[in-house]
Amino acid sequence: MNWKSYVFPGGHPPAALTTGLVVFLTAIYLLSFIFALREDLSLAPESLFKLQMSRLSLYPLIHLSLPHLLFNVLAIWAPLNLFEETHGTVYTGVFLNLSALFAGILYCLLGKLLYPEALVAGASGWCFTLFAYYSFKESQIRPRTRIFRTDYSIPTLYTPLVLLVAIAVVIPGSSFWGHFFGLCVGYAIGYKESWFNKITPPGWIITKIEKSLDGLIRLIPWGIKYYRDEDIDRTKDYEPLMSTETPLPLHNDNSGTVLGTA
């Protein structure tokens, strides 16, 4: 893996919200040793029915162990950086809040029937939302993805599902349903992003907020980029996340040999 391209996706500096989120998740983890944050903010199926909104929106911030935190930080870094770069910093914050809320509601609804006592916490739901979102976008360009540069491939759209099952097998204590519903939200947003945009603040409101906070935005350290909404075109064509290799052709135009997929 090219670690430089992972740390600096697209060769661009780290995005402001993504960087701030990593720092904040680490701070929350450390504070959880002093305050009962895990007990207060972990999401339980009953949280929805008791209208515990703090749990419904903040459960991704809580991590139960250092490996839990590290894995999620590493997993979310590149896709969230790219999302922020193409959608704007404030919009990305709205995206994270709404996706956590939607996944949390689904988790609680099914959990009331199947796992009434099971708690869920951590940013892995966000990770799976981003994985599903980008796998859907990527599948429109590259329908199949090679497995570790072998001659074998799987449908790009289903790659997050493979990861979901693999994690459930390798780490039995992980929250399968929390990951699954994060995945569902990501697929839904990727499929109908125009619908999702209708429930987010209009661009002119975000721009107005940013102008009122311009003094604070200018305090962001050098080397970290804040993406202003007025500079973002969310209608531009999707750009591949990690790879720039040529997609496999879907048909034979009689100009050469069609590449096969295993």
From Swiss-Prot:
Residues 38-57, 111-112, 169-174 are lumenal. Residues 252-262 have a biased composition (Polar residues). SUPFAM superfamilies: Rhomboid-like (SSF144091). The chain crosses the membrane at residues 17-37, 58-78, 90-110, 113-133, 152-168, 175-191. Residues 243-262 are annotated as: Disordered. GO terms for cellular component: Golgi apparatus; Golgi membrane; nuclear periphery. GO terms for molecular function: serine-type endopeptidase activity. It comes from the Eukaryota. One of its GO terms (biological process) is proteolysis. Its EC number is 3.4.21.105. It is found in: Golgi apparatus membrane; Golgi apparatus, cis-Golgi network membrane. InterPro entries: Peptidase_S54_rhomboid_dom (IPR022764), Rhomboid-like_sf (IPR035952). It is an enzyme of class 3 (hydrolase). Probable rhomboid-type serine protease that catalyzes intramembrane proteolysis. Present with 7850 molecules/cell in log phase SD medium. PANTHER family: RHOMBOID PROTEIN 2 (PTHR43066:SF1), RHOMBOID-RELATED PROTEIN (PTHR43066). Interacts with SNX3. Belongs to the peptidase S54 family. This is Rhomboid-type serine protease 2.
